[in-house]
Amino acid sequence: MATWGRRRAGLGGRERVTLSAGECYIVHEIYNGENAQDQFEYELEQALEAQYKYIVIEPTRIGDETARWVTVGNCLHKTAVLSGTACLLTPLALPAEYSHYVSLPAGVLSLACSTLYGISWQFDPCCKYQVEYDAYKLSRLPLHTLTSSSPVVLVRKDDIHRKRLHNTIALAALAYCIKKLYELYSV
C-alpha cells in the first residue's frame, strides 16, 4: 500500500512534476479594504505583463470576466478562419452564378472579425493566454492553497501561428472579394 495515491512513471504513466515559483502566479482573494477589486485587477495585469506560464485567478468576478474575454477572442479568431475558408472554398463547391451570394458575405465577415481581433485583442497581454480545463494539468498546480472552490486558470500559449493563420486567410478573402466585386461591377 506504499504506492497508493501515487502515479507510477511507466509506460503510459504520467509523472507528477512540480513547478518552479516563476512559472505560476496566484491572484489570491484577500479583501483588504474598499479597493480590493482594483488590487485584484492590478495583480492580474502585473502577472500578465510578467508572462507567467500559469496564472490562477481566485476572485470569481475578475476570473469570470477574464475567461469571457479569452472566449470572445477565441470566437473572433475561429469565425475569421472559418468564414474566410468558406469564402475561398465556396466558388469551388457552388455554381459560379450563385457562389458570390455566399462567398462575399463570408469574406466580409472574415475581414471584420480579423480586424476587430487586431484592434481589440492583438496588443492585449491576455490574448497570449487560454483558459485551462485539463484535470491532469490542473493537478500539477498548487491549487490546494486556494480559498476559492472554482478558480480560473490561465496558461500562456504562443499565438503567433493563429494570428498568422487568420490574417492570411482574411487577406486572401479580401483579395477574392475585391476581385469578385470588380468582376461583378465592371461588366
From Swiss-Prot:
Arranged from A to Z, the UniProt key words for this protein are: Membrane, Mitochondrion, Mitochondrion inner membrane, Transmembrane, Transmembrane helix
Q: Which InterPro entries match?
A: TMEM11
Subcellular localization is given as: Mitochondrion inner membrane
Q: What is a biological process (GO) this protein takes part in?
A: inner mitochondrial membrane organization
Under Pfam families, the record lists: Mito_morph_reg
- Would the keyword Transmembrane helix be found if you checked this record's keyword annotation? yes
GO CC terms in record? mitochondrial inner membrane
Transmembrane stretches, start-end: 79-95, 102-119
Keyword Transmembrane found:
yes
Q: What does this chain do? A: Plays a role in mitochondrial morphogenesis.
Its family remark reads: Belongs to the TMEM11 family.
Record's protein name? Transmembrane protein 11-A, mitochondrial
